[in-house]
Amino acid sequence: MINLERTAVGKAIFAFLLALAVSSYYFPFGFSFLPEALNTKQILGVLGIIVFMMNCIRDRAMYWHKYVGVSCFLACVFSVWCFICCVYNGTEDYAYAKYFLSFFVWMGGAYGLVSLIRANHGKPVDLPMITKYLTGACVLQCAFVMLVAYVPWFQNMVDTYIVQDTTARELDRMYGIGCSLDSGGVRFCTVLILIAHQLATNKEVTSSKKATYLYIGAFLIISIIGNMVARTTTVGMLLGLGYMAITIGLAHRAVLTRRQVIFWSVFLVLLAVMIGLGVYFYNNDASMRSNFRFAFEAFFNYVEKGEFSTDSSDVLLERMWIWPWTGDGWIFGYGLFEWGNWYQYGIQTDIGYCRFTLYCGLVGLALFGLYFIYNATVVARKFRDARLLALILVVLTFAIWIKVSTDIFQLYALLFCIIGDYELEELEAEAALEE
């Protein structure tokens, strides 16, 4: 009997299934034949809780890192403050008063996912490994996006059996499976930054032409198709390019090393190939032309009109900067977050800073910001050469709030559950001593 797991085809199948599992965590969705409230993130969360309890029973102890406890405490403090704001304002919009539940669901999902990956590989999951899977999941989502857009039977299957936000379909925007609009764009952003980190700091990647080509190719694919899904992806693309420019060269060195010349040559060649393909499809496919013009609207407006702007940026500047209009509103907000609750007041804003302030005041906004700053400091301490990575993740958090009220804790949950560089070194040292 052929051992499927040991064959090349078998390995490819297992890798695809794991990438699908990662995608189901990072881009959660439901099924039409399951209860409406149940999605893939929650399924993985239940799996994670079961595995965690089994590990606790096996080890006869309940253990989690101190930083998870601190992060949980900050999430609970923020939730309590949001609840106080709702009580103070006499509302029942508990969107973020229940944030602590979201914390536990993401942590459970991350723990379950990391347990699956570890079981498949038989070793601890580290940052390079989880970056590979997240990259694969995002490229897979890009493939889903194109299939939904250009293969009718696939779109019909997704629309029939997959339960997800339908806003993208209603707005005639591109979407994948659990991936659409700004929430999908923000997740693309985080992975673009992780790819840049691997290209800049991982010697196994930089010493391998194949790995370098694959990561650069993935970076470009996610940047292009991700922008077709949501132009928020541009933020991650620019931060990733900035990260690579600072760490790999160009930004502070007058003379380039051989490694830098090779890296940027490969990058420019692959970029030229992508541009060539883009120009071909732009000129020969009306639908692709429309998608390219949406994805890079600012560029086209600059070339054609001399204005570096988009329709959404104009709307943000003109109508969406809305702040509290009473003194106590600046402290406690108005206890309203969901769009439907604001319609009666004629208020519509996507801007994260405004929505959080209107919901729970500047105090709540500050608590939420502190929560993500702390999560980033954990990343800086847990992984080698990760200070710049942590800083860029903080910049991403506060940058996306200019456009939308979402967050990136799903990434931090994964990074909390994988092994840190220094922990891995200790395990390797212990294993060497035992041998």
What are the language-model segments listed below?
Residues 175, 180, 336, 345-379:
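A conserved mid-to-late transmembrane alpha helix and its immediate loop/hinge
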Residues 13-30, 46-108, 395-399:
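N-terminal hydrophobic segments of proteins, predominantly signal-anchor/transmembrane helices
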Residues 193-197, 241-242, 388-398, 405-435:
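Transmembrane alpha-helices of multi-pass inner-membrane enzymes
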Residues 242, 250, 359-400:
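Hydrophobic transmembrane alpha-helices and their immediate junctions
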Residues 1-13, 205, 256-264, 268-272, ...:
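A juxtamembrane structural motif centered on a specific transmembrane helix
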